[in-house]
């Protein structure tokens, strides 16, 4: 009997041992860490030996750099997005420009710097800038690594969570021991903790790898503020900001002989300390400037204690000569020619500032426009001229006017706080309701220091007529003309608190007439908002629209007087 039992026991023991071994193998395979290494080129999304992955702060981006002559180059758009928007490329004349307070630095695309490297190269239809060149004018650090190619850009020095490895361990593509290995990290390696989870934490290494390590292998994360050691000091674009509030009035001058109307339009006007005559315009697409300025006009204005800020526009000759601001401003030589004319005219006439009123700038021409403002600011700064720039009420669709950069370069950024409803509007409405003006001021002062912001008010309104068939027409009239029309029709206006204006509506043989009036009461409401936001000034479009209602100027000057 015993002889029969022993073989059975041995068999059972063998079965148990086999099962235990199988279970052990299974458990080992399931829970032991994989040693399979990740394809690092695939991880960084690299195709070709010249591509460079970009790790921007704590993010592996989709954009790629270019490795050339052992230096890293980034596309112009990438430089704008991540590092510095002030670099400008003239694609027509093949130039790279950067504007400083007193000069615009210029180098040709493909041209070598004094240090013996190429500042900008053109490849595959794109212009690429050398990081070493960009760093001269920008506040960031970078480190370039190879095998695989990657560059780590640092532009953010906010407090981070850092930890150290308590033992040698693997950095993996994903959380889990079966995930591929990115790097084998040594005990004591410092990492930035990006996200804490239950068993695995997402971390970033100093050389740009972002992956996962087991939480148990990390010390407790601690706050750490990186040391900012870029060595960069932002230049001061100090201009000619006045030490008092600005009270500006535009004077529409369309022919040279109209300069003689200056004494008449100023009769009875009080409080104004700046007058801006519409003297200059872009004449054609070669960069010629048309001008009707008068030195005697400036002398008369100075005798009254007024500064003169000569206006230049981009629309006077748009229809007759096909003026296209982008075609002009996209050439450095044309921008330079325009600026030289304006500086020469300042010497000839003696005016005190320049007011830029470019209203036809498209999104495609945005970079060319703002570069013109930069370069003009240098010339004005050198000559002691005030530079002001006119803008539509800010909205998303006109953000390409780049208000924040205007606020750096120009002395004053003017909101043309009207045309909420204009001549081409399909529905009747206010030219400048209080809410519309307030929203414009609030948005502009988010990007431009309030002391540099001037809000312009309209001295006109629109008489709207809606016919029986629904057709809407309007005409712009001055303040007193609007009231005369209301009185003629024996109507009466009442205050509408929702728009901050007096409103009137009545019937005529032509249809329903609606008028949102601009008057002393509505202007006072707007001025109160301007005071609340501590703006740098007020402007009015335009002299003559007061229609003899001279007390309106006392209301306007109430802002600048405080």
Positions of predicted regions on the chain:
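Hydrophobic faces of well-ordered beta-strands that scaffold small-molecule active sites
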Residues: 247-251, 273-277, 308-312, 354-356, ...
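Catalytic domains of carbohydrate-active enzymes, especially glycoside hydrolases
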Residues: 258-283, 341-354, 526-537
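Glycan-recognition patch characteristic of GH18 chitinases/ENGases
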Residues: 225-336
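Primary recognition of N-terminal secretory signal peptides and signal-anchoring hydrophobic helices
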Residues: 2-197, 227-241
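SH3/SH3-like beta-barrel fold
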Residues: 188, 200-205, 213-214
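Glycan-binding loop/region signatures in secreted carbohydrate-active enzymes
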Residues: 232-233, 317-318, 459-526, 556-562
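Active-site groove signature of glycoside hydrolases
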Residues: 271, 279, 337-368, 412-427, ...
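Substrate-binding surface in catalytic domains of secreted glycosidases
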Residues: 285-292, 340, 363-488
């Amino acid at each position: 009997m015993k002889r029969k039992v022993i073989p059975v026991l041995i068999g059972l023991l063998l079965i148990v041992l086999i099962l235990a071994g199988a279970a052990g193998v299974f458990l080992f395979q399931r829970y032991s860490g994989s040693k399979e290494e990740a394809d690092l080129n695939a991880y960084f999304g690299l195709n070709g030996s010249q591509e460079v992955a970009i790790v921007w702060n704590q993010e592996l981006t989709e954009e790629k750099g270019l490795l050339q002559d052992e230096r890293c180059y980034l596309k112009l758009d990438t430089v704008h997005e991540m590092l510095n928007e002030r670099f400008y490329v003239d694609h027509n004349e093949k130039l790279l420009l950067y504007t400083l307070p007193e000069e615009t630095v210029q180098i040709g695309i493909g041209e070598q710097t004094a240090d013996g490297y190429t500042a900008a190269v053109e490849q595959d239809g794109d212009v690429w800038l050398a990081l070493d060149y960009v760093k001269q004018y920008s506040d960031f650090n970078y480190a370039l690594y190879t095998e695989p190619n990657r560059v780590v850009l640092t532009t953010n020095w906010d407090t981070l969570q850092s930890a150290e490895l308590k033992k040698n361990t693997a950095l993996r593509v994903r959380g889990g021991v079966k995930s591929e290995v990115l790097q084998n990290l040594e005990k004591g390696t410092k990492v930035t903790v990006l996200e804490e989870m239950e068993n695995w934490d997402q971390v970033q290494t100093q050389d740009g790898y972002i992956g996962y390590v087991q939480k148990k292998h990390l010390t407790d994360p601690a706050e750490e503020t990186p040391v900012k050691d870029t060595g960069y000091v932002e230049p001061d674009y100090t201009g000619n900001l006045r030490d008092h509030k600005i009270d500006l009035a535009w004077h529409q001058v369309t022919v040279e002989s109209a300069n003689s109307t200056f004494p008449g339009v100023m009769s009875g006007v009080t409080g104004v300390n700046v007058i801006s005559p519409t003297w200059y315009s872009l004449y054609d697409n070669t960069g010629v400037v048309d001008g009707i300025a008068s030195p005697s006009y400036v002398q008369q204005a100075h005798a009254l204690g007024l500064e003169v800020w000569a206006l230049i526009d981009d629309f006077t000759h748009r229809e007759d000569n096909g003026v296209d601001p982008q075609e002009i401003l996209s050439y450095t030589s044309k921008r330079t020619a325009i600026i030289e004319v304006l500086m020469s005219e300042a010497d000839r006439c003696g005016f005190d500032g320049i007011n830029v009123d470019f209203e036809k700038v498209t999104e495609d021409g945005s970079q060319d426009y703002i570069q013109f403002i930069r370069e003009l600011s240098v010339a004005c700064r050198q000559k002691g001229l005030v530079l002001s720039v006119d803008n539509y009420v800010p909205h998303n669709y006109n953000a390409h006017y780049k208000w924040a950069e205007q606020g750096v370069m120009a002395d004053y950024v003017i909101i043309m706080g009207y045309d909420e409803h204009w001549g081409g509007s399909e529905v009747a409405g206010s030219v400048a309701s209080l809410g519309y003006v307030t929203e414009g001021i609030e948005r502009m002062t988010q990007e431009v220091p309030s002391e540099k912001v001037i809000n312009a008010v309209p001295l006109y309104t629109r008489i709207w007529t809606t016919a029986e068939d629904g057709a809407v027409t309007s005409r712009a009239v001055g303040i007193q003309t609007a009231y005369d029309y209301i009185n003629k029709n024996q109507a009466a206006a009442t205050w509408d608190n929702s728009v901050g204006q007096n409103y009137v509506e009545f019937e005529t043989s032509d249809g329903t007439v609606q008028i949102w009036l601009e008057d002393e009461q509505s202007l006072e409401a707007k001025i109160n908002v301007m005071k609340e936001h501590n703006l740098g000034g007020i402007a009015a479009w335009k002299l003559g629209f007061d229609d003899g209602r001279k007390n309106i100027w006392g209301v306007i000057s109430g802002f600048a007087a405080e």
